[in-house]
Amino acid sequence: MSFVEFNNVTFGYKEDDYLLLEDLTFSAEKNDIITVIGASGCGKSTLFRLMTCLETEYKGSITINGKTPKEATGTAAFMPQKDLLMPWRNILKNVTLPLEALPMSKAERISQAKEAIEKVGLSGCENKRPSELSGGMRQRVSFARTLVQLWHGRGLMLLDEPFSALDSLTRISMQDWLIGQVKGLDATVMMVTHDVEEAMLVGNKIFLLSGRPVKQIKVIDVSHITCREDLYTPSSVELKNELVRAFLTEKAERGDNI
């Protein structure tokens, strides 16, 4: 059994008059690093909402490590698009937040939060407020908070466009930083992105969503791309152009923005 399985899943939001997903089947294996791309509104983030029980009215079956999303509540460590740091809490207290509902002492929470902060390269910033940090540093804090969730029995990390709000130079720096972070994890990682190069660089597989509703996912192996220089080989450039053409075709067919 795969770590994540969608079997014949059909879903649409009640306020919409169309389906986003129809009889969709796919799987993700343990320790896969998957980047999810597709046109705006095609259902990328919806996959995460289904896996985290934020949406529960669907047909078909979804399992995470053999359990339904409801049974597996808390299995996924989730990093949203916006960092959602609490401005009145310092960095240490922001990172300890997911641990406060767990049966552990304050000393244990602080110790684990400090370890996560160290792993993301922000030691010495524990007492700073979010407003004192740059955008890239705030995203590192958000990742540290996601790490402490992952350490408590969660085998799945979901990253929803974590760098979309950053400027281009910070984004490139954070992409290179993230690669080193996720490849050392004992977890299945799925990341939504609109950036084709980011998808090719961070993941070992790309899930390409297209159509409305999405009926199948095209899986593309990019495990041969291990560093930024690999993006400029002839085969990688050809793949990038193919993915961009797929985006443009989808845009033309739907008549909306990508």
Predicted regions and their residues:
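Short coil-to-helix segment of the ABC ATPase nucleotide-binding domain corresponding to the Q-loop/switch region
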Residues: R89-T96
